[in-house]
């Protein structure tokens, strides 16, 4: 493998950062419903149980958490892991892969029996399949009570009420831009690491992707609203912030035109991701900042400068490239060439030489030749990608790529995928092995799932580390000496000087 080693170092130094912005005081009226969602307030007795099943990306996980927040707060529902005892059952769907709709209807069919035993169980379908299918879901599965899109989950209490009063299905798959964030309860931390959605949708319209059609075009949350949510989380012990968006580095958050902006005509009307990261870094208790998922077109010099100046910005970047062939990238409508992608990585490594870079790859895109695939493999060799995601192309109805002819046999696609994954996994394993003997900064997240007598956390380059330690370390950043590299994790011991 050529290029940089990608092994993170401990105690790295960065150039002095410029003066930053004053932080807002927590103000739940900026972005959230008033105090009923505040974790400091007692909840009323449970009025039923709620089950949520989530498919798909981290944004869906975030949305499901917000559904739970809304319904446990406003409807006094209690979460359950058992759909058979639930009064409300929701499935948050993903449409990124082929046959997603069939999987949803199959799951709904299994739940149908829960409505036939005399219980008034409400079944709802949310997420991207709901946005795509709309009324078709109710026509095909008339026992479904609610159909709602990613942008209307905050309306669930009203939809449930209307369903019970009118005794007919409720459908709302509209795109009310950023409205949902104005009606969500104050965020509740579930541990030392928290996700914060800063923008929704995507306006890039890659030829293979359904996101612009299911989540709408790019809409950014106001700058101060994001900081207010983070301020609430920081008061609850959150130490790591994960910024979310379908195209997160396209963030353009409107800034409050306060006195500083009035006296400075050159002040920007919005904050980009780099400026937002600088503002988050001013929270003393926030020790690590991450963001996902990015688009290479939006990977700006401002973001490179943030990596240069902000030590809290994790030494890891996930930047989906999809292919190393310019011909395929053009057919995908990605808007960049392989050389332009490498140029962005070169700029980043000039300020963070040891940064870990992961990516996404689509194999078997219509028309992909052996030469195209070899160019992808060459890019992998040139960059030295760490842990990455790779998939065989999945034709999505309604996207431009779904009309392209595809003559490549499935067997060849599978062979290419296996070849690519073998190389990516080898690179990742090599990086893990070379971390043995190093000292890594780890955010302790809680007990290990496999051994509750041990603790677990993540390194900056997203590797889980399991190690013996005192539970009082949970929620803290500690130094861990890495002693062993396993297939999907590391082992270590607490480092003492």
UniProtKB/Swiss-Prot annotation:
As its record notes, the protein acts as a catalyst of: N(6)-dimethylallyladenosine(37) in tRNA + (sulfur carrier)-SH + AH2 + 2 S-adenosyl-L-methionine = 2-methylsulfanyl-N(6)-dimethylallyladenosine(37) in tRNA + (sulfur carrier)-H + 5'-deoxyadenosine + L-methionine + A + S-adenosyl-L-homocysteine + 2 H(+)
Q: Please list where the region (Disordered) is annotated.
A: 1-50
Compartment(s):
Cytoplasm
Q: Which InterPro entries match?
A: Elp3/MiaA/NifB-like_rSAM, Methylthiotransferase, Methylthiotransferase_CS, Methylthiotransferase_N, Methylthiotransferase_N_sf, MiaB_methiolase, rSAM, rSAM_horseshoe
PROSITE patterns the record matches: MTTASE_N, MTTASE_RADICAL, RADICAL_SAM, TRAM
Task: Indicate which residues the UniProt annotation says bind [4Fe-4S] cluster 1.
Answer: 57, 94, 128
Q: State a GO cellular component annotated for this protein.
A: cytosol
One Pfam annotation reads: UPF0004
Domain TRAM: residue ranges: 433-496
Q: How does it assemble?
A: Monomer.
Supply the name of the protein.
tRNA-2-methylthio-N(6)-dimethylallyladenosine synthase
Classification from the root reads:
Bacteria, Pseudomonadati, Pseudomonadota, Gammaproteobacteria, Lysobacterales
Which gene specifies this protein's sequence? miaB
